[in-house]
Amino acid sequence: MARIAGVDLPREKRVEIGLTYIYGIGRVSADRILEAANVDPSTRVRDLTDDEVKRISAVIDETMTVEGDLRREIALNIKRLQEIGCYRGIRHRKGLPVRGQKTKTNARTRKGPKRTVANKKK
């Protein structure tokens, strides 16, 4: 099993699909990485040579932020927005949608499950 950027890639999948198991790498990024590393995208992960794995790892290390570093960077960006008190930071803090969506009816993913409010007695 090939281990790249601290992630074990599934042996039976093609390399371009296997690379997407790394956080921060999608299909397009995987294709670009393989092109830069001069590796055939249709090769299975189990058929990769040690040299090819090293070339792929080198390209990822040089050009991309992946896995823990990327997660940390995103968390720090959100924390910075909250500290400066901008609109996006406030929305993050309140757990509401950040990108301008309406919240009257939907937005349940960000808000969480409904909390029922008791009716006032007359």
From Swiss-Prot:
Example of a GO cellular component annotation carried by this entry: cytosol
InterPro entries, alphabetized: Rbsml_uS13_C, Ribosomal_uS13, Ribosomal_uS13-like_H2TH, Ribosomal_uS13_bac-type, Ribosomal_uS13_CS
GO molecular function annotations of the record: rRNA binding; structural constituent of ribosome; tRNA binding
Described function: Located at the top of the head of the 30S subunit, it contacts several helices of the 16S rRNA. In the 70S ribosome it contacts the 23S rRNA (bridge B1a) and protein L5 of the 50S subunit (bridge B1b), connecting the 2 subunits; these bridges are implicated in subunit movement. Contacts the tRNAs in the A and P-sites.
Region (Disordered): 95-122
Origin superkingdom: Bacteria
Keyword Ribonucleoprotein found: yes
Keywords of the record: Ribonucleoprotein, Ribosomal protein, RNA-binding, rRNA-binding, tRNA-binding
SUPFAM superfamilies given in the database record: S13-like H2TH domain (SSF46946)
Subunit field text: Part of the 30S ribosomal subunit. Forms a loose heterodimer with protein S19. Forms two bridges to the 50S subunit in the 70S ribosome.
Record's protein name: Small ribosomal subunit protein uS13
Gene Ontology terms describing biological process: translation
Pfam families: Ribosomal_S13
Family: Belongs to the universal ribosomal protein uS13 family.
